[in-house]
């Protein structure tokens, strides 16, 4: 809800609609970038002509969420456009990435989860008619590096002692859309229904809590410490091998 107020709304659109908005937003953005042809900038000192207007085109976008005339009032970059990076692991997020992105940033609590996501995302890319090799997948990871494994573990233990559980509870409340302060810290993680927030991270945290039988306090520590990303503790060689 707080995020919605920064975008002229009082409440979040549904999860599905947010991805519809994102897809159309990218359509508009691509039209604006592509509105400048190669050679549109001429810089003719003799005539004072900066650009070739015949090579600059309006977007003329009239969609459900955006109406944009264009053209873009600045030239596109030498490479045409920046790299498109999408973050998300829900089916809707994977579909958007498959259609539009070069890189996906995701979270995977284990190697098996990461491999499953990789297979799923690459299949979405194939279904979008793109080469699967043209989309890179970057899973988040939190490395704790030490000269020895014992030293690394000691560092990780010290960091865990500094975790602010209240902050973790705030994060869980925001992610799940439920006031987690209403539940006992040392009790089980409550079963929460569907959310219109970020669904993939909620799914990851819920499955992690069930798999490792975490209490709410322990899950809050995970949320505050690693945000649900995989933690690897060890020497530099351990982490590289992992």
Language-model features, listed with the residues they occupy:
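Hydrophobic faces of well-ordered beta-strands that scaffold small-molecule active sites
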Residues: 1, 82-87, 102-106, 135-142
């Amino acid at each position: 809800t707080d995020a919605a107020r920064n975008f002229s709304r009082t409440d979040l659109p549904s999860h599905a609609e947010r991805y519809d908005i994102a897809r159309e937003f990218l359509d508009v953005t691509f039209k604006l970038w592509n509105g400048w042809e190669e050679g549109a900038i001429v810089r003719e000192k003799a005539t004072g002509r900066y650009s070739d207007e015949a090579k600059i085109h309006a977007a003329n976008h009239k969609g459900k969420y955006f109406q944009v005339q264009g053209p873009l009032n600045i030239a596109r970059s030498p490479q045409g456009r920046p790299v498109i990076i999408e973050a998300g692991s829900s089916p809707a997020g994977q579909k958007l990435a498959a259609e539009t992105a070069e890189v996906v940033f995701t979270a995977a609590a284990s190697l098996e989860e990461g491999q499953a996501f990789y297979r799923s995302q690459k299949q979405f890319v194939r279904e979008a008619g793109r080469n699967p090799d043209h989309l890179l997948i970057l899973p988040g990871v939190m490395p704790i590096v030490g000269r020895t494994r014992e030293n690394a573990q000691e560092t990780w233990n010290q960091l865990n002692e500094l975790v602010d559980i209240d902050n973790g509870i705030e994060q869980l409340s925001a992610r799940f859309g439920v006031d987690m302060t209403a539940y006992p810290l040392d009790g089980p993680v409550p079963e929460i229904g569907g959310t219109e927030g970020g669904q993939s991270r909620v799914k990851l945290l819920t499955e992690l809590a069930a798999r490792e039988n975490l209490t709410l306090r322990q899950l809050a520590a995970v949320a505050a410490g690693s945000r649900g990303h995989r933690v690897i503790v060890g020497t530099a060689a351990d982490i590289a091998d992992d």
